[in-house]
């Protein structure tokens, strides 16, 4: 189940998933509920959405979406690429800012936006990370960041994690 305003890269990933797809109206939890109600309760489901939609500047109703995921036994996958390094007490993103880190199953982030480097990551339980590494060609046929980029990313994360002033300036742009 995908928010209609998800980033093109997310939509492309969903297309490659070779599974039934349902698109819900942007940030419309009532529409999402209707779709979830129509599905077999025993069927695996994942709700895919962004925390912050950069094109129109709005935030997802993360807590409400997580509540629906709990109610309908669905997984949650959140794209925090426009939020990490910018929001939260340590730059962990909108979920950190709202105290919802423990409510989301899979996080997607980037080192290319606020951190100014290159590369991306997922954060999830060991079980999910191992499954993604095993079945996702994008992870199987890629290489790790070179040490110089990993060091630059580490430095950027440390700076933004500890300097709320810089994060605030980014938010005000």
Labelled PLM ranges:
Residues 1-6:
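Conserved PLP-anchoring active-site segment centered on the Schiff-base-forming lysine
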Residues 8, 29-30, 51-56, 83-87, ...:
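Short, small-residue-enriched loops and turns at beta-alpha junctions
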Residues 8-17:
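Active-site-proximal loop->helix
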Residues 17-19, 98:
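Glycine-rich tight-turn/loop motif centered on a GG-T
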Residues 20-23, 107:
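Conserved beta-strand scaffold positions in the cores of enzyme catalytic domains, especially
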Residues 22-78:
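Active-site phosphate-binding strand-loop segment of PLP-dependent enzymes
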Residues 72-75, 82, 87-173:
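Active-site C-terminal subdomain of aminotransferase-like
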């Amino acid at each position: 189940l995908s928010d209609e305003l998800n980033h093109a890269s997310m939509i492309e990933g969903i297309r490659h998933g070779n599974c039934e797809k349902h698109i819900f109206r942007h940030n419309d939890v009532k529409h999402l509920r209707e779709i979830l109600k129509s599905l077999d309760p025993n069927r695996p489901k994942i709700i895919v959405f962004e925390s912050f939609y950069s094109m129109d500047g709005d935030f997802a109703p993360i807590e409400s979406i997580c509540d629906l995921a709990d109610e309908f036994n669905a997984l949650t996958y959140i794209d925090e690429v426009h939020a990490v390094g910018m929001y939260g007490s340590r730059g962990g993103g909108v979920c950190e800012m709202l105290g919802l880190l423990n409510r989301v199953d899979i996080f997607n982030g980037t080192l290319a936006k606020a951190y100014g480097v290159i590369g991306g990551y997922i954060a999830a339980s060991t079980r999910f990370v191992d499954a993604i590494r095993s079945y996702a060609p994008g992870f199987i046929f890629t290489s790790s960041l070179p040490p110089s980029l990993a060091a630059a990313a580490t430095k950027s994360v440390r700076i933004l994690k500890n300097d709320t002033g810089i994060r605030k300036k980014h938010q005000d742009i």
